[in-house]
């Protein structure tokens, strides 16, 4: 999220190894030989792509989001969030606030399902919003790379093969 001027998508994530857990989930959801599927997975992807489209159409919110993320990246440029739990929690809270100030103001809302007791917990809500903000960054990279909603729906095998390749042979920055 905070790597704004990275030379490549791989550099945004510090290499594909850093997103290997996400690649495994993607593989599990797209692989027809896997029985364990989350029916909400594809819906979440479609919702994120739709939200991206609305964000691009609303220049005021888009510019506000860009400004807030740029400020956040500058603030955390020298902070080691991987080894400082307090700073990491603060970053999650700030990302959640940015999500509430921008993406949650768009007409479409992403519905998160789960146990009400866990969803009502404020820290869990912040983690979800932070995750959705980071997911939106990935949607931007997907779109910048030529990806579309239709690609996700009709080129699943190509995406699955790419995920398998990145899992078996991770790319480094």
Indicate residue ranges for each PLM-predicted region.
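Charged, amphipathic alpha-helical oligomerization/scaffolding segments
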Residues: 43, 47-50, 54, 64-67, ...
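Long amphipathic alpha-helical segments with strong coiled-coil/leucine-zipper propensity
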Residues: 2-85
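Alpha-helical oligomerization segments
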Residues: 127-173
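Conserved binding-pocket/active-site segment within a compact domain
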Residues: 77-147
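Charge-rich, low-complexity amphipathic helices
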Residues: 70, 77, 117-121, 150, ...
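Exposed alpha-helical structural elements
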Residues: 18-21, 25, 64, 90, ...
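Residue-level signal for well-ordered alpha-helical segments
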Residues: 3, 25, 32, 42, ...
